[in-house]
């Protein structure tokens, strides 16, 4: 078996300079502007505070509503202390006009010559402009991944940028590029699924959509890759807790999506709040400086997450003092600290200055950090004196944007089961719809929607239709609705109670078919920690009672993460996974249910069957063995990439041709053999039959989503070269090895040899 080390592979060596001549000019300008600053001014550029630090508060220190800038605080922090960045929304979503007034007030200090640099403002607009009243809300990233359609990711990024910049905010803390391989994690719904290729392609398109070709345009924002890197695999499943990731797997699984985003031009990165292999992300010099900045050529800024520099001392216990924490983080390559409170920010400024005076942080490192910050500000056009007024964005909340969000929801919805073609529904049928999740937008959107946790129903988008409201328009009096259960949070944990079970069953007796929407309370970060993936007993009990009626029961899963439904799946006639589809998920679900649109979503993760077993599609051969006669060794509820349709597709004529020079051309014919037009995700997998490191069962190497009319067929071609056969070896080098391989596509497979 012959090894080939790929000396030029992107994850291991210095990459070419992808930045244009114009970027080089901007970089030199940033260096010049940095050189004109005093040490105090430079340090202040690295400090980021939350909006609340600038707002008026009452006698108890609570922000006064409606919010208003405290001019004295603004003068102190922005004009006198020259703080470089502000973030966040205060309490809840704001109108464009309010946002614009806030940003203009903050920007006026620079406009009037009272600061040396404009303030860089950032928010978490992770599934649309979710902190702007009337913003277009898309599916959460896990649903976006289920579309397997990079074009939709680009469109979501473009619209989110337009509507976020309409508020005046130029920096978006998105996309999340962490892999979704720990479903217990509270932020699983923010990921692009379990596969690095899928996450890379979808994530790169989000970046391109956010930034366009010129981030300084008034319709673009700076993207922020997060959370670099390994944050999403906590051993405990709880947020901000340790991960153990071998370097080989870090290279092969967790870094590629970030590398793809760097190649797409991402301007900023947010660092992992947790620790990996005992090293907190914020002091990992190898990852931040050696790899990201030096080897990958990343020229943008690296920002901490919320209070994470302080936590090096208070939580991680790797720094003996706050000063040590600052020294360790900045020297590791951090450029900006999300401090973020008024008061602690002064301690940060003072301790940072002491560290520079004591030569614990070099002026070279400080200059580099500030140059990166100013570079991003220049790239965004923030040195222009005037912000674009909020009312000069005619497409904000437009039908065009709403239709794009609905298209994303439509292509995300995944049909997992459809016995006896119980779907689509007929309008003549009497339908019982059950479930609180069907009748409240908070269960369609999840966290990061109008508020941090997304629980406050008072800010639900006016005019957006729940699944219940949308289905009612189609079925009129033929639709009955019962809430069925009540979800709430008690002491921080999700609680559920069955409501009016007798009434639910009474209406079930009058129905031809029953739809029950299952849901979870919206939550993220530490408030979203869970102890189990099991669906709550109350919802399961209600489903079982409805199944006992003998009527066809259809499950709709409105979950940000998979929940265990093993006990209720067998007697369910149909199951649809809607993820968290956004404000237009209700309309999208209705169009799927009545057959106006054919479902085309595919699972972006392996759907688990058992609470204690986490499986991935790229398992190794030893995991496929068992001595249990009545058990399958690999037994998910549904596999990665699975999704059904109202039509059928056939795969045929899989062929592979050796092109020489270590390249092969693969081709396959895909035909719509059913009665309806549809979209199919053609997935190409390669198996390395024997390797020096235990090979995966298969690896996704290419995918393409195509549209086919009934009877139509298309020939698809995939060119395979050495990079499609690579893996990371025992010395953490990307290599490929000559030998036998198997290409799989649909139900077809073909063997080939790389010589």
Question: Where in this protein do the model-derived segments appear?
Answer:
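Bacterial Sec-dependent N-terminal signal peptides
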Residues: 1-24
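Glycoside hydrolase catalytic-domain context in secreted enzymes
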Residues: 18-726, 733-745, 749-751, 755
